[in-house]
Amino acid sequence: MAQDWHVGNAHEDGQQHRGWVIGHFLGDADGVRASRDVEVKWGVHPAGEGREEWVTDEKRTTLLLLVSGRFRIDLSVGSFVLENEGDYALWGPGIDHHWQAEKDTVVITVRWPSVSEA
């Protein structure tokens, strides 16, 4: 049922793809959510969860927007803590990163373009 509109719940829709609700990894049956232009993730992270290994050789631009909680993002250019609703970090291609949820956290991640990491 491919179509050019969709209404849903990001938490539910993202369960199949680790929180990602829009991106190239969705099939034609997902309609407008299948995109090679942008990826959107609803990220729910318990306190202490993180990515210890650095993400390197990134080819996309990334926006990380804090909905709730406290979230540390370590970039190759510095470390930042998102702690107030609406705080965000934005970085371009070539910036390495890793992260940790310092409290139970909800973030929205937007990356563009949507490309395979392989």
PLM regions: where:
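Short histidine-centered beta-strand/loop micro-motifs
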Residues: 32-34, 51-58, 75, 81-82, ...
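A short, N-terminal "cap"/entry segment at the start of jelly-roll beta-barrel domains
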Residues: 1-47, 52-54
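Residue-level recognition of conserved beta-strand positions in structured domain cores
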Residues: 67, 75-77, 101, 109-111
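A generic "binding-loop/recognition-motif" signal
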Residues: 59, 95, 103-104
